[in-house]
Curated annotation (Swiss-Prot):
Organism: Rattus norvegicus
An example Gene Ontology CC term for this record: mitochondrion
Binding site for GTP: 118-125, 147-151, 165-168, 227-230, 262-264
InterPro entries: EngB_GTPase, G_ENGB_dom, GTP-bd, GTP-bd_ribosome_bio_YsxC, P-loop_NTPase
UniProt-recorded name of the protein: GTP-binding protein 8
NCBIfam families the record matches: GTPase_YsxC (TIGR03598)
């Protein structure tokens, strides 16, 4: 039922796209992304490149460098190729592997790994469900109650990589959360990137700062994802993005300078994030 509801939401997005003609010169193996490419340029930019869309609202005297959108700026063709990595097929099985409360209980895999962490109710499970929208048999449980995820959940994406959903920190976090997460982050040798989710409506909280300090202390390469961008006006969202971007530029060492604004409801930014994950895990070779 959960997968059905997700596909219904995706369908509403694609119904809008199908009313427009095809985007010339671009080929995608993903039917869903091919439909996205039918959008007019302005709408396509908002869905695929949300930072570009936000940049249109910057005043001319804004300080340069606050939105570092060109660091990872793939072509639509590359984004289309990445879609196939996240599409479940007979040859590309996407599946839930197992859950673990301790690292020594985690599956031992050689393929690259990425993990998602964030405070309770930041929208982590909703985002992971959006990433796996083309793998409807993969069940990612979403709860209205914060702190639903209590264990490390491992999802295998074909032969490409493993995605790890970490418990949320803060409200109703597991008692052994710190030990669980610290041990994983320090000792997981095949961990390629940590994705830290921040609520774009709330901004960076004290709890987020603790997670940031942990990543910095362990010298981990990490990326900041701004969730729930559909819940704010453009003006407020732009203000939040600029503030968080300045924080990243001036207060961090290991954070990737480019932010990834995301909406799991409208799928804005989801396709770009898929491409980034596929790129850093070597899945686009």
């Amino acid at each position: 039922m959960a997968a059905t509801r997700l596909w219904h939401r995706t369908g509403r997005l694609l119904e809008i796209a199908s009313a427009f003609g095809p985007w010339p010169g671009v080929y995608s193996t993903s039917p869903a992304f091919a439909e996205v490419l039918r959008m007019p340029q302005k709408q396509l930019r908002k869905v695929v490149y949300p930072l570009r869309e936000l940049e249109q609202h910057l005043v001319t005297d804004s300080r340069p460098g606050l939105i570092e959108q060109r660091l990872f700026d793939p072509s639509l063709e590359d984004i289309g190729r990445a879609e196939s990595v996240f599409a479940a097929t007979v040859r590309n099985r996407i599946e839930y592997l197992s859950s673990a409360v301790r690292l020594d209980h985690a599956p031992s895999l050689r393929q690259p790994e990425v993990c998602f962490i964030g405070r309770s109710n930041v929208g982590k499970s909703s985002l992971i469900k959006a990433l796996f929208s083309m793998a409807p048999d993969v069940e990612v449980r979403i709860s209205k109650k914060p702190g639903h995820t209590k264990k490390m959940n491992f999802f295998k994406v074909g032969k490409h990589f493993t995605l790890v959903d970490m418990p949320g920190y803060g409200y109703r976090a597991p008692e052994d959360f710190v030990d669980m997460v610290e041990t994983y982050l320090k000792e997981r040798n095949n961990l390629k990137r940590t994705f830290l989710l921040v609520d774009s409506v709330v901004g960076i909280t004290k709890l987020d700062n603790i997670a940031i300090e942990m990543c910095e202390e362990f010298a981990l390469p990490y990326v900041m994802i701004l969730t729930k961008i559909d819940k704010s006006s453009k003006g407020y969202l732009l203000k939040q993005v600029l503030q968080i971007q300045e924080f990243v530029n001036t207060q961090t060492q290991g954070c990737f300078p480019q932010l990834f604004p995301i909406s799991a409801v409208t799928y804005s930014g989801v396709h770009l994030l898929k491409c980034f994950i596929a790129d850093i895990t070597g899945s686009l070779k």
